[in-house]
Amino acid sequence: YSLDVNAAMQPGVMKGSENQNLGANFNMTYMKEKLTMRASVSLNESNSQNSPYGSFSQYTRLNPYYIPEDANGKQVKVLDNNTVSGQSTVITNPLYDATVGIKDGTNSLNVTTNLSLEYMILKNLRVTEQLSYTRGLAGSDRFLPADHSSFELEDDLTRKGSYTKSSGEMSSWSSN
């Protein structure tokens, strides 16, 4: 038999983002005369948090001359506001969004169980059976408060802010 445990804690590229992966594997083999039985169980969990500072692509669209802070050192919500032919274009500050308390993360959990039986009928003749069962759970959680810059052009106060929570599960059997 064997037992393996692994963990990987990785900071993301953007400030405040991270990925955490945990896993464990248990393997066992039993042999008696003409019968061999193998069993394994694998458990894997993954959690990630997206950066409250926005995505890298948001920063690539900003001009270097925008000033993200006011005279008091406080982050401003809007960096630039243009109206062309009646259409408003707002350039928002992703640094501001980090101060309003957003939540944006995902998680998953997977369990896989394998069972293999082998029986030697004759020296060159054997019967095998393999069973596998997998169960998985996944979810995400995203909260943007009403003061988040993505709602800057929204005038209706009842449409500002959002919360999205999703979850899913799967299971599968296979046999050979």
Where are these regions (language model features)?
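Surface-exposed loop/interface segments of Gram-negative outer-membrane beta-barrel transport/assembly proteins
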Residues: 12-14, 23-112, 128-130, 134-176
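Short strand-turn segments of transmembrane beta-barrel domains in outer membranes
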Residues: 1-17
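Short, solvent-exposed loop/turn segments in extracellular or other extracytoplasmic domains
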Residues: 19-21
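Residue-level signature of outer-membrane beta-barrel architecture
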Residues: 1, 7, 28-32, 117-119
